[in-house]
Amino acid sequence: EANADASASGLVRKLDVDAKAWPMLAWSWKVERPVAKGDVTRRSGDDYAARVYVTFRVPPERLSPFERMTRSAARAMFGDDVPDAGLAYIWDSRAPPGTIVPNPYTDRVRMIVVESGSARAGRWLSYERDIAADYRAAFGEDPPPVSGVAIMTDTDNTGERVRAWYGDIALSRAPSVRKDSA
């Protein structure tokens, strides 16, 4: 269970995984309700009752000189765990599923709406995504190694109160045989 009351809560699991060899990400979650004032396109609305992040470590040769400088500065301030890129699978309040937009704080993270609105709130929902294909769609190139997976429930921008539950999260080599809800 994750709660946010004008705050944010998250949990990170560091990994070192080849995204092309282990491309399938499966998870389940349930929210009481989405963040009413959430807006995937604005910093003031960058809050979600549920999100699952996949972070990536981009080899230095794939970064521009400016990106390498920014990465060095970020790691000097925050340590080596600062990811180079990320995909955030979110439950938005209004954008339709399938929407992919840059995070309002950084262009190195893409927000991918997998659920929207309140119609399915209060129910456990399961998802399976091909993170390699999603990375290509979001960034236009093959994915680098996965450096971590995280969950986050946050309302620090909107000041709302939400609650979410997260089930198992797994990476696999091939799609599951079960029929997912999304």
Regions found by a protein language model. Name each.
Residues 41-45, 160:
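Short consensus segments that form the blades of beta-propeller domains
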Residues 1-10:
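Short carbohydrate-recognition loop motifs
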Residues 28-34, 57-59, 132:
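Solvent-exposed strand-to-loop "edge" motifs in beta-rich extracellular domains
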Residues 50-52, 107-117, 121-160:
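Extracellular beta-strand ligand-recognition surfaces/modules
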Residues 149, 168-171:
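Extracellular beta-strand elements of beta-rich domains used
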Residues 47, 51, 56-105:
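Extracellular/luminal beta-rich ligand-recognition
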Residues 22-32, 147-153:
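A short beta-strand element within beta-rich, extracytoplasmic domains
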Residues 14-25, 118-121:
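Extracellular/lumenal carbohydrate-interaction signature centered on repeated Trp-anchored short motifs
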